[in-house]
C-alpha cells in the first residue's frame, strides 16, 4: 500500500508525485517490520507525540505527521 504524504507545516515537497513517478532500478515498495514500527512509536511517545493507529498501521504516517505538527517539532 502506498501512502502519499503532504504537510505544509513540515514543508514536505509539493513535487512528491514526480519523485514517486521517477523510474528507478530499485524496487520502490518499502516493507517495514512491525517491531521497527513499534520502536518508532516508542521514540515518538518519548518525544511527546501522541500517535494513534489501527492494527494494520494503515494511517500511521498521517498520524505521525499530524502529531509532529501539533508538537511544533
From Swiss-Prot:
Query: Pfam families, per this entry?
Result: Orthopox_F14
**Gene Ontology molecular functions:** protein sequestering activity
GO biological process, any = symbiont-mediated suppression of host NF-kappaB cascade
Quote a single Gene Ontology cellular component term. host cell nucleus
Keyword DNA repair on entry: no
Do the record's keywords include Ribonucleoprotein? no
Name this polypeptide is given: Protein OPG058
Natural source organism: Vaccinia virus (strain Western Reserve)
Q: Which gene encodes it?
A: OPG058
